Amino acid sequence: MSGGLTPDQAIDAIRGTGGAQPGCRALHAKGTLYRGTFTATRDAVMLSAAPHLDGSTVPALIRFSNGSGNPKQRDGAPGVRGMAVKFTLPDGSTTDVSAQTARLLVSSTPEGFIDLLKAMRPGLTTPLRLATHLLTHPRLLGALPLLREANRIPASYATTEYHGLHAFRWIAADGSARFVRYHLVPTAAEEYLSASDARGKDPDFLTDELAARLQDGPVRFDFRVQIAGPTDSTVDPSSAWQSTQIVTVGTVTITGPDTEREHGGDIVVFDPMRVTDGIEPSDDPVLRFRTLVYSASVKLRTGVDRGAQAPPV
């Protein structure tokens, strides 16, 4: 547990920001699943011995989403977007990557993130609560430009970058290791909409646009890793890395919508703590807490206890 904060308390705070619905994810409630593949580059195997990084093509399940807990949120509303990828390994197991349009988290701890959500609860005193929070968390003021960037409205799920917030330790076959952060970069040019243009769009235009785009061919993202430098924190997701060493380790190719998963009680969870041989989670407290919140959220919305299927904390 993180500093006395429980997963249920975190979920209550998340739902308190408005729009949450029973039976839906606490965040990123509105999303769509897609099928595709992943093929690693030759550079990947030099960085990690993970089985999906050996250069062979593996199946992938991809989910694009809006960040809100409101499953009916209009796609034209400003907000963080998410892209998650589940790689199926040769032995049938899976490993996950979770990324979003925000480059950094607003806090280095679960408690700090939840305190901000509590300050954002809709109500007459919201402006005062937010002002007080900003005054007592001066680092957040410096992050405001990045937050505005993260909340831009993309013209397509396929025209914006997504970033993993946490560090992972990649271990190569020769035993060498390094910490990395993940970035999913579209091969299409980045494109965003103005607020006025977005207001004229249909409520589900991002899903509709991607469906039309896929009719013309696959959508691709470069999977890049940023390798930590000596001064880059591996445990603070609110701290920007100074390292400019970035390596493309593969390509995610999205071929079409998924029609099999999340039907008839099937549950899909994209958990960044679900790693595999050659990849280890850092000691980032937010990363460690996330898997507990995911398990609690699954139980609340479905009644199912993930139990042994949940990654180790």
Curated annotation (Swiss-Prot):
GO biological process annotation, one example: hydrogen peroxide metabolic process
Positions of disulphide bridges: none
Active site: H28
Documented EC number(s): 1.11.1.-
Chain residues that bind heme: Y294
SUPFAM superfamilies, alphabetized: Heme-dependent catalase-like
Signal peptide from the UniProt entry: none
Pfam families: Catalase
Cofactor(s) listed in the protein's UniProt record: heme
Enzyme's top EC category: oxidoreductase
Gene Ontology annotations for the cellular component aspect, listed alphabetically: cytoplasm
Gene3D superfamilies: 1.20.1280.120, Catalase core domain
GO MF, one annotated term: heme binding
Domain of life of the organism encoding this protein: Bacteria
Keywords, comma-separated and alphabetical: Heme, Iron, Metal-binding, Oxidoreductase, Peroxidase
Role played: Has an organic peroxide-dependent peroxidase activity. Exhibits strong peroxidase activity using organic hydroperoxides as cosubstrates, weak peroxidase activity using hydrogen peroxide and negligible catalase activity. May have a role in elimination of reactive oxygen species, in particular by deactivating hydroperoxides.
Family per similarity comment: Belongs to the catalase family.
Subunit structure of this chain's protein: Monomer.
Protein name: Catalase-related peroxidase
